[in-house]
Amino acid sequence: MPPIELSQTQFEQHFGYASQQTVFAPGRVNIIGEHTDYNDGFVMPCAINYGMSVSFAKRDDSIWRVYAIDINETDAFDIKKEIPQSEDKWKNYVRGVVKYIQERCPEFIQGADIAMTSDVPMSSGLSSSAALEISIGKTCQVLGNLPISLAEIALIGQRAENKFVGANCGNMDQLTSALGQKDHLVMIDCRSLDISPTPVPQGYFIAIINSNVKHDLVTGEYNSRRQECEFAAQFFGVKALRDVSPEQFIERAAELQQLNELAYKRAKHVISENHRVLEAVEALKANDMQKLGVLMGESHDSMRDDFEITIPEIDYLVELAQVAIGKNGGARMTGGGFGGCIICLVPNEKVEALRKLIAENYQKQTGIQETFYVCTASDGVRVV
């Protein structure tokens, strides 16, 4: 059953009456621009046709009752009182967003019954957490008729994940889930929050292949990567690595390498990756899919060798995909790293060959069964 239908039927089953409204927030996949968002850089993701559905109804008090359908767990808290952190991680995503919505809009004290479900695979690098944050943020906005923009909801979602959940993520995932556009990739400037939509190339599909090796950003090495980037930014005397051009990096690279080898490698990735995103925009405008494929390949190599966030299973998937796709199109790891998914921009006529090559080889080599999704670029959060 699709998530929208599921959240509505399960709401009624669980609470004993029908929900009033439903919000759907999509997951996202990033075509290029990895670990650049928290360096104030550029990214090029799209919202996907998988996401989080939240069905809800107003209560006549200030209690929130939350039913997480997929794990069959519940939460309850009073939003007129201080909202405490929970030992259950999923509850903190919901509580954190509500808490920071209230900081922005202190008048928000509307209680609600909520049932939520997602078809974004957890810990896959497709932003199941951002879809949850944005769907809850939009739910608050609708419940209280609050005067907040989608971009603000995105930044509140990021803040909840940073401060309340404890994952030091950037803002790309939340911005994409909030502001995605159907049939478009969105180039986001993570400093100014400017968004430039670019149509998905005609005759191409977005294929996502999940390695089914799970990652966890809170306990993973994500936070240490962020610290290494901040060290490099301080070395260059700038606010963020976005402010260092490739030429400036080359000029002082040897000095940084001597001082801190890891910071050197991380900076090399971020600075070159920012440049690749800008080149990718130009390649798409020119419909130069060969160039885009080269950029995606360079991005993957940089994540593997300099940012050191790929794993053998992911590298193997990318190798297989590159063989199947050929020169027109590309493949790379997508998401935070240490598992998760690869993304492929693949000509329509090669989708089945790609699926077949991976089905014949990946499990044989790794002992793990992959999951293959063909996605469409979708609109951001919406009331359905």
From Swiss-Prot:
Annotated GO MF terms: ATP binding; galactokinase activity; magnesium ion binding
UniProt-annotated binding residues for Mg(2+): S129, E161
Keyword Magnesium: yes
Top-level taxonomic group: Bacteria
InterPro entries: Galactokinase, Galactokinase_bac, Galactokinase_CS, GalKase_N, GHMP_kinase_C_dom, GHMP_kinase_C_sf, GHMP_kinase_N_dom, GHMP_knse_ATP-bd_CS
Active-site residues, Swiss-Prot/TrEMBL: D173 (proton acceptor)
Site feature: Transition state stabilizer: R28
Class of the enzyme per the UniProt entry, highest EC level: transferase
EC number: 2.7.1.6
UniProt entry tagged with the keyword Magnesium: yes
Record-level GO BP terms: galactose metabolic process
GO cellular component: cytosol
Pathway: Carbohydrate metabolism; galactose metabolism
Catalysed reaction equations from the record: alpha-D-galactose + ATP = alpha-D-galactose 1-phosphate + ADP + H(+)
Binding site for substrate: E34, H35, T36, D37, Y222
Keywords: ATP-binding, Carbohydrate metabolism, Cytoplasm, Galactose metabolism, Kinase, Magnesium, Metal-binding, Nucleotide-binding, Transferase
Localization of this protein: Cytoplasm
Pfam families: GalKase_gal_bdg (PF10509), GHMP_kinases_C (PF08544), GHMP_kinases_N (PF00288)
Residues engaged in binding ATP: S123, S124, G125, L126, S127, S128, S129
HAMAP family membership: Galactokinase
Its biological purpose: Catalyzes the transfer of the gamma-phosphate of ATP to D-galactose to form alpha-D-galactose-1-phosphate (Gal-1-P).
Family statement drawn from the similarity comment of this UniProt entry: Belongs to the GHMP kinase family. GalK subfamily.
NCBIfam families referenced in this protein's UniProt entry, alphabetically: gal_kin (TIGR00131), PRK05101.1 (NF003472)
Protein name: Galactokinase
Gene: galK
